[in-house]
Amino acid sequence: MSGVSNGGMFIYSRAMERLAGSLASVGPVCSAPLRGYNPLPDTPLSIIDFHGLNDHTIPFSPELPTNLGLGPDNTVIANDGWYYHIKMDHLARIMEHMHCDPESTEYPTHMDGSHGWVCSLWSGCDGGKEVVQCNAHYGHDYPFHNRYIEGISILWDFMKSHPQQANPGY
């Protein structure tokens, strides 16, 4: 399951909370959970996350100059006035819950280096699941908008390599 912006927020909230046992993997794009909607998956699942470093709608980090700073519960206040959980804090919380290796390794793709594209892999998660986070210099959109279609092939390759298996419950 994949979703962009609000669709990615759906994945980070309701899909993780209620559908994790039915999904092999998820691929949220340019999204982060809203404050108060960041449940942990009830069963482990693989995640590939794409986020533009220049996203001013749902910020990747609180350091973007157009953000309004940090909000309650260590959220970032975006220029739209919403409070979003900081992306890497949320992923770290999920990875800790799924007992992933704390250190990341490079996750090579055919886009590496293009516009700063880099992907990091955390493996060793419960049930053999993995978490990948990819980012580059683009905004609130699918990676590189419609100039490149490689983002979807990276997502699809990840999902094909993480089929549904019996998952240990928590």
Region roles according to the model:
Residues M1-S46, H56:
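Primarily recognizes the serine-hydrolase "nucleophile elbow" in alpha/beta-hydrolase
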Residues N38, P59-S61, E106, N167:
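Short linear functional motifs in flexible/disordered or boundary regions
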Residues L40, F60, H145-I149:
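Conserved strand-to-helix beginnings and helix N-cap segments that scaffold or border functional pockets
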